[in-house]
Amino acid sequence: MAAPCLLRQGRAGALKTMLQEAQVFRGLASTVSLSAESGKSEKGQPHNPKKQSPPKKPAPVPAEPFDNTTYKNLQHHDYTTYTFLDLNLELSKFRMPQPSSGRESPRH
């Protein structure tokens, strides 16, 4: 069914048709640039636009309106530089001392 159509279009047209019809390569078809864009095939015959219809694009989904006044994570707004300072002070008495090699640490 598609073989005679592919043979008439030449190599570039065949690739273009394969990319447009293949389900896996549907996203790549628009990015591939082909030399058969001029309207004529490799043999010099005029290109018949009725045989290939351009793929129909689905209607764009309307974007959800952006509203940052209804932020759900209310705890996030309470964070400051000193938020966990009291927790660190409470837990510091439970920390184990770290072993040292006996020499000073390098100054970075």
Swiss-Prot record:
Transit peptide endpoints, chain numbering: 1-34
Pfam families: NDUFV3
One Gene Ontology cellular component: mitochondrial inner membrane
Positions bearing Phosphoserine: 105
Keywords: Electron transport, Membrane, Mitochondrion, Mitochondrion inner membrane, Phosphoprotein, Respiratory chain, Transit peptide, Transport
Membrane topology: Peripheral membrane protein
Domain of life of the source: Eukaryota
Protein localization: Mitochondrion inner membrane
Disordered, as annotated region: 33-72
Keyword Chloroplast tagged: no
GO annotation terms (biological process): mitochondrial ATP synthesis coupled electron transport
Family classification: Belongs to the complex I NDUFV3 subunit family.
General function of this protein: Accessory subunit of the mitochondrial membrane respiratory chain NADH dehydrogenase (Complex I), that is believed not to be involved in catalysis. Complex I functions in the transfer of electrons from NADH to the respiratory chain. The immediate electron acceptor for the enzyme is believed to be ubiquinone. May be the terminally assembled subunit of Complex I.
Assembly mode: Complex I is composed of 45 different subunits. This is a component of the flavoprotein-sulfur (FP) fragment of the enzyme.
Family annotation (PANTHER family): NADH DEHYDROGENASE [UBIQUINONE] FLAVOPROTEIN 3, MITOCHONDRIAL, NADH-UBIQUINONE OXIDOREDUCTASE
Protein name in the entry: NADH dehydrogenase [ubiquinone] flavoprotein 3, mitochondrial
Organism: Pongo pygmaeus (Bornean orangutan)
Lineage: Eukaryota, Metazoa, Chordata, Craniata, Vertebrata
Gene designation per UniProt: NDUFV3
